[in-house]
């Protein structure tokens, strides 16, 4: 297992409320109630259970409106990452350290490169050895037992990204979708067909056209994030 990210000292608390998408009310261990920034604007299905232990980071910037940021939540003994700003940073570190063998060989890593016919930006473009690889990253927290699911709601943006990647594949360009499984208890991945059937259809169409799908497992702890390898893919 490769440690790809280390947290600064975090503050433990209990989740009391999530509201207006961007805010979480957390009771600290000393009983103080604080409002933390919620860096995940999605529905957070099943990962915002009130009364669950959480960890917050604290900004040293005195000018910041909210000092605390919600980083993770403990669900039945598994820490689940909440901060959606972290996955791309961690994947970049993984690419620099070349721990994801499935992406092949490359010399340069470019970020946020414009591409496609729908005004998109690819998260990572790997070039320099062999064919370039366009790599998109999606964070997933929803699960059914040990099965990770994406998406957790209808995502027109996610559908657009799949269409763009499919067009690349149809023109002979290598493209990949990396699902950042933001919890260590999942060993398999499946599209969330019941929540966004069109997304599942597009993902299957992409695979048929050569899209590389990488469901990458990560273990989240209050100390660090570790890469655990890839999960199996279930499409039935």
UniProtKB/Swiss-Prot annotation:
Entry-linked Pfam families: SfsA, SfsA_N
Domain of life: Bacteria
GO molecular function: DNA binding
Spans through the membrane: none
InterPro entries reported in the protein's UniProt record: SfsA (IPR005224), SfsA_C (IPR040452), SfsA_N (IPR041465)
Family: Belongs to the SfsA family.
Name the record gives this protein: Sugar fermentation stimulation protein homolog
Native source species: Gloeobacter violaceus (strain ATCC 29082 / PCC 7421)
Gene name of the encoded protein: sfsA
């Amino acid at each position: 297992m490769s440690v790809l990210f280390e947290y600064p000292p975090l503050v433990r608390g209990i989740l009391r409320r999530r509201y207006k998408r961007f805010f979480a009310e957390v009771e600290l261990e000393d009983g103080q109630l604080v409002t933390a920034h919620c860096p995940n604007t999605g529905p957070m299905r099943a990962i915002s259970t009130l009364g669950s232990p959480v960890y917050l980071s604290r900004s040293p910037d005195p000018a910041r409106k909210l000092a605390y940021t919600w980083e993770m939540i403990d669900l039945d003994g598994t820490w689940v990452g909440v901060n959606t700003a972290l996955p791309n940073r961690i994947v970049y570190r993984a690419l620099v350290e070349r721990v994801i063998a499935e992406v092949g060989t490359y010399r340069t890593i470019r970020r946020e490169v414009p591409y496609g016919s729908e005004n998109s930006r690819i998260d990572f473009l790997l070039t320099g050895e062999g064919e370039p690889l366009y790599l998109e990253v999606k964070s997933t927290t929803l699960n059914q037992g040990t099965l990770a699911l994406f998406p957790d709601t209808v995502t027109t943006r996610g559908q657009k990204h799949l269409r763009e990647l499919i067009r690349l594949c149809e023109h002979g360009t290598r493209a990949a979708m990396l699902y950042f499984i933001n919890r260590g208890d999942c060993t398999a991945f499946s599209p969330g067909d019941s929540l966004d059937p069109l997304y599942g259809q597009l993902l299957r169409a992409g695979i048929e056209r050569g899209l590389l799908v990488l469901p990458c497992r990560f273990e989240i702890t209050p100390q660090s994030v570790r890469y655990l390898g890839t999960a199996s893919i279930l499409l039935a």
